[in-house]
Amino acid sequence: MNWSDDGIVLGGRRFGEGGLILDVLTREKGRRSGLVYGGASRRKRAQFEAGNTIALSWTGRLDDQLGRFDVAEARKDRASRLLDDPAALAALSAITSLLRGGLNEGDAAGSSLYEATTLLLDQLTEPNVWPALYVRWELGLLSALGFGLDLDECAVSGANDGLTHVSPRTGRAVRGSEAEPYVDRLFALPSFLIDPRADVLPGDIAAGLRLTGYFIEGRLFGSVHRGLPPERERLLKRITPPA
């Protein structure tokens, strides 16, 4: 069997003498792994940095077995452009670790995340853009994997205006007036997550990351008895203003 596709590099690990088992998110096949002969060599190492997009071909006997990747060319080198931006590098590490931890090999949901992930990665050089986009991407990750939040209407009244909080129990939005008696037990819902025209206010990114992180940890990683990847924890600490 064989196929060709573009893939976002999620990571890799050494195998044997100079080999590399490469982990990628492909446009059509979702998350896939394959062996790249000589992939750990100094000459080839740079193109396999996490976050880069490469054109590759996969060959194997059976689709569910580890096959071989032949890399045709590097489509986009992103990692090297972020070397002087620790926050963007932290976001890149969080993105790839969440995809590696949240997607199974060949998971069809991976294909639905390819374009959104490409868009986010391409914006990591724009510090005024990517933080809000990143939080929206995490919401999309939850939705694509069947753990989406319901932010369309109030869980109590059914109203679709004035939504200010999210219930940690149900993942549903709550209107401000209904949320008031329980506000200390709810997550704040930043306006930019329900209205794309809303300004991103101070504290909104941190609030958004706490919201999505809770459900990613509890619903996605909790289902397999794992916590959030440490890369995701480091991102929250890096972009959360000190108290």
Swiss-Prot record:
It comes from the Bacteria. Keywords: DNA damage, DNA recombination, DNA repair. InterPro entries: ARFGAP/RecO (IPR037278), DNA_rep/recomb_RecO_N (IPR022572), NA-bd_OB-fold (IPR012340), RecO (IPR003717), RecO_C (IPR042242). One of its GO terms (biological process) is DNA recombination. GO terms for cellular component: bacterial nucleoid. Pfam families: RecO_C (PF02565), RecO_N (PF11967). The keyword DNA repair applies. Belongs to the RecO family. Involved in DNA repair and RecF pathway recombination. This is DNA repair protein RecO. The lineage of its organism: Bacteria, Pseudomonadati, Pseudomonadota, Alphaproteobacteria, Hyphomonadales.
